[in-house]
Amino acid sequence: LGLAERAAARSTFKQAVEYARKGQVTKSRALQGSLSDYPLAPYLEYELLSSRLGQTSSAEIDAFRERYPDLPATPLLYQRWLKVQGQRRQWATLYSRRYDTTNAELQCYFVRAQYGVGEKSAALDATTELWVRPKSQPKACDPIFSVWRGTERFSQDIVWHRFNGAMQAGERVLARYLQRYMT
C-alpha cells in the first residue's frame, strides 16, 4: 500500500473504532469490511465486542479467542466478558469456564458460580479462602460472603485470623470493619 492508501485505511479504522465505542455497531461494521487487511483490524473487532459485552454470545467470544490467541487484548476481553456473565448470574456459563486467576473479582464470580450450580460445600470452602485474605475483597464477593457467614465455617477464630492479617498488612479500614464480627 502507498502512503495515501495507508492514511485512508488509518482514518477509516479510527472512524470505525469511534463508531464502535459509541455503540454505533452498524456504522462500524460497514467500515470493517474495507479493513480486512489492516494490521489493527483485530482491535476493531475487539472494540465491537466490547461495546456489547452483555449481548455477546459464548460462540462469539470463543471465535475471537480462537482467531486471535496471541493478541494482547484477548485475555482482557475474555475477563471482561466473564465478569458480565457474573453480573448477570450466568452461573453455568461461568462454572464451565473457571480457571486459575489472580483477579479477585473473577475468583468471587467463579465461587458464586460453583455455589450456583450446586457445589455448595466446595464453594463455601473456597469462600473461606477468599474471606481470610488480609485485604478488602471486591463487591462481587459480598453475596457469597453473606451466605458463608451464615454457616459453621464462620467463627471467631477466622475473624481474628483475618483481623490480625489485616493489621499486619496495614489494612486499618478492613480491621475496623472486622470488629463488628468480634464478640
Language model feature labels by segment:
Residues 1-183:
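Alpha-helical solenoid repeat scaffolds
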